[in-house]
Every structure is written in structure tokens, then in C-alpha cells.
Amino acid sequence: MKEEMNLPENAFRELKDGEEYKPLMSPDKVYPEVNGWSVTWGIMMAIIFSAAAAYLGLKVGQVFEAAIPIAIIAVGVSTATKRSKALGENVIIQSIGACSGAVVAGAIFTLPAIYILQAKYPDMTTSFMKIFMASALGGVLGILFLIPFRKYFVSDMHGKYPFPEATATTQVLVSGAKGGDQAKPLLIAGLVGGLYDFIVASLGWWNENFTSRVVGWGCDLADKAKLVFKVNTGAAVLGLGYIIGLKYAFYTCLGSLVVWWLIVPGMSIAFHDSVLSAWDPSIVKTVGAMSPEEIFRAYARSIGIGGIAMAGIIGIIKSWGIIKSAVGLAAQELKGKSDVDENVKRTQRDISFKIIAIGSIVTILITFLFFWFGVMEGNLLFAVIAILLVAVIAFLFTTVAANALAIVGSNPVSGMTLMTLIFASVVMVAVGLKGPGGMLAALIMGGVVCTALSVAGSFITDLKIGYWLGTTPKKQEGWKFLGTLVSAATVGGVMMLLNETYGFASGSLAAPQANAMAAVIDPLMNGVGAPWVLYGIGAVIAIVLTYFKIPALAFALGMFIPLELNVPLLVGGAINWYVTSRSKDAKVNNERGEKGTLIASGFIAGGALMGVVSALLKFGGIEASIAENWWVNPMSEVCSLIAYILLIGFFIRATKKKSRNYNP
């Protein structure tokens, strides 16, 4: 366990002509990877982190990638049990467990919209089986569609893509193999973050948000000028911002500030006495009579939706060459002699293209039958159009999802799914499927596409980790299917639990992406139309941003996720910049940065898991919170700010504290 283990010098740079990357585990040897230990722990991680990610995603609209915390737990357990040669096993644990965040993102960005619209249309009904099938089938399609692109992203483009999350996870696994004291900072941070978020969610000792309305002039500014500042003070969201990093968090927050501080006040000035209800007859207030939050929900967020859709289209155009080459490679292999080329190194063996082709056809057929009998109530035409839309869009957007993970470590599936929903709704209405039945069908279709893209993007991270360390891709690919099915079952259960406990229509669960999906699909399916002008403005903004090489997707995401959830991302990103740049010694900065990643992972895992515990307590009728009466008092927000500053202080101080035996 303590043998000399370091990644090769050329692990993170482009290879020179004729140079070959040699992974940590030799391609010529066989190592323990898939066994009872790794599969059991992988399934446990998938269940635990699916529940945690579902709660966090529905509460604040952000889903963390579970790869890093799962890798740390895998390392901690293998170290505690003194398992030898556990590196390959830990990669499998991480790969199976990481299905959690990916499947959750796919499910919760779309399927809760069914519950949200159910309040308005009681005829719309869903079940555990529908949620499970949409998530499971989408996840399986995502894995099958991504495998042909593995070699391009992880091997051909070696050193050209940063793979931020894969890098962090790989470093954790390597550090564990060295025998360092990796788990301690994570456990302490998990306890701190978990206790902090539990106090807010279950006890209500301080407000979960700090806003400018805490003072009198702030209330006046919000009422008259429609200007407001808000920040969620939770530990989990702060940790998320740290892992995302300053650059991506900055552009996301910038998009949010443009909407909240320019567009929202600007609309109030320009249309102060107007009722803008052309695409939503339920709007009866003048713009001037609305709060900033109401203007955002009714109008400004639609600009972000248009921006996300256009950024997705630009992504497909940029990826067209990759798609063509991968399809060509798959066609060549299908015409080849055998399933497995014995000359291919262990570290380059994939599931054969024949199995992928057969698996894809069977999965598409099962999805078609699910649509035909489970969603479209036996209408063959609707089912055929639905499966064609889902299969083509999921395949085309697979490279966009993988590209996003490879560059920024964050998968913009919500934007791509919004575009899918808009397109699918227009097509389904054209063939005669409207009203609540059409909404349900389009949302289930969106759930399948969203999960496919989310799992595909996440899986490229796992495969890059395996490439750096020297595991067998075929084993990662095969066991990823099991993790996907387990995660799909877990997220279905958690989603139904949270709906019973809080209710998606109550406002207690932010679920911003699902609310956006509901807002888009309702007018489209009722023939009212949609805010095409606002979508168009967003699309133009995305084109202009792309021209100036500004990440349009990050900016547009910020435009439609609420301000209070974007500001803490910037705070976390700023902490990342601060702790990794204060020393003149690059090695010290690097050590602090990695320590910060462990602490942020602890905040995320601890905060999210306690969120699930809080939901279970509430569901069981155990209520000890003083929030209902206390949170209306501005002092609850003052307490929130003080607690947040102390939390940030702990974070920064903990990164500078040198652990005994800490060996990054």
C-alpha cells in the first residue's frame, strides 16, 4: 500500500510525437478490479449519494458530481481494512457509485415538472415505475452512445482537455494508494457541513438566505427599483462553488447579475404600467406591481432559456467532426473480423461495437414500447415520433455533454434538455398531441434524453480516471449499467418522498430546472404559444458571447438559476482562488488546493446527506424547527450572515492547517 506510486510526468500534458502514455497500473499485468468488495461498496455509494444528490438538486437546483467524495470514501475504507492493491477496486467503486449524481441530474431536472403541473392539471399522473423507467432507459442509452467516443476523448485528446473533476478524483485515488491521511479532512468537513446544514434545515436557528431586504432601504430598493441581493448561506452550495472554481462560477454569477440587476429593473422601467401576458394568461399584474422575483420568473428567466438552447446548438455544430469520426470508426469495427482484438492492450479494451449496436437497438426498442403503452396510451404514431426524437437528440448531444465535462467539469444538461422539450413540444403539438397528455409525454421524453446526456457526460470522467490509472475500460463500462439501474430506483423513491413531504408546487423545493421545464411546456402544449421574443434575445446573447469567446452556456445557466444560488458559487470559487494563490511556493498552493477539494467534498456530502435526514424527519412528523416564526425576523438573516462568515473562516483556515501524514 505504501509502495512508490506517482502519476507519470506526461499525465496532464500533450504527448510529443512518438511519445506514449504509460498508466500507473501496467497494461501488461492483471490487477484486482471487479469483485464482491468493489461491487458491494459501489452499489452502497450509488444508493447513498443518489439520495443526497436528489435532495440537494431539488432543494437548491445544483447537483454535485459524486466522484470525488466516493473516491475518498473508497480510499478511506480500503486503507482502514488494509486491502492491498486496492487501486483498481477503488476505481470500480467510484465508477459504479458516481452513477448517482448523473442519474439524479437527469431525473430531477425534468420529471418533478410533472408534479409541479399536476397542481394545475390533476389529470396528469405519474408513478414510481414511470420515473424509474425514464431514468434507467436514459442512463443505459447514455452509456451505449458514449462508448464509441471513449478513445477520442480520453486517449486521442490526451493533455488537450483539462478534465478538472477527473483530475481531482484521480489525485485522491493516487494519494490513497500512497497511504496518506486522506480521509481525515473530509470527515471533519463532512461533520461541520452536515451539522451546519442540519441546524438550518431541521432546527431553523438561522435563515438559509441572506438578502438586502434585511435593512429598510434594501426593502425600498427591491420594491421601487426592483434591485435585490441574495445569497444562500448553506455549506453544501459553498463547497460546490469551490469545486466548480472561480472562472466558471464567475461567468455563471455574471449571467445572474445581468438578469437581476439590469434586465429585471430595466423591464420595470420600460413596461411599468403594462400587463405582459401574451404567452401566459395567468399573469394579471403590471410589471411595476411585481416583485423582482416575480419579474424574473415571468419574463427574465426565459432569456436564459433561449441562451441555453442556442449554446447547445453551437456545441453540436462544434462537435460535428467528432460525431462523424466516431460513427465512422464504429462502422469499420462492425465490418471487422472479431469482437475482441487480442492484440489490443488491456487498458484499451472496450465492450465490442457489435454488443453496443445490439444493446442500443434493444434499449431503443424497450423505450419505444414504454412510450407506446406506458406514456402515449397505445397511440402508435405518437410513440414512433417520440422514439425518433429521443434517439437522435440523445446521440447528437452526447458529444456536447462529454465536451463540457472534459473542459469545465460541469454538465449543462438542463439547457440541452430545455431545447429538447421545446423542439419535442412543437413537433408533438403538430401531430396532434396536446394538453396534459402532451405535457406528460414531452416531460417523460425529456427525462430520458436528460438522463442519457447526464450519464454520458459523467461517464467520460470515469473513463479518463481509468485511463490515467490503468484500469480496464470494458469492466468500467459493463458495471456502469448496474450503478445506473440502482441510482434510477433510488432517485424515484426520493423524488416521491420529497413530493409527499414538501410538495413541488409549494415552493419549499426550488427545483429551478424542473420549474423552468414546466414554464416552457405549459404554454406550448396549450396552444398559447411561448415567449419566442425572449428566447430569441437569449439566443442572440449566446451567439455574441461565443463570438467573444465567453462561455455562453455558463452565462446562460446563470441567467435562469435564481440569484441566491449563483452568488455562493462565486464565493466558493473565490475561496478556491484565494487558497491556491496566497503562497509564493507553487507546491504549497497545490497542497492547499487539494486540501480545499477534500473540505469542499465534505461540505457537499455532509450537507446533502443531512438534507435527506431532515426530509425524512419531516416526513415522519418530527418537527423541531423554529423557522416559521423566526425567519420572518430580519435578525434571522443577520445570524445567517455571521454563521456564513464563520463557515468561510473555518474553510480557509482548514486548508492552511497541515495534517500529520497528509500526502497530496
Regions found by a protein language model. Name each.
Residues 1-664:
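Alpha-helical multipass membrane-protein architecture
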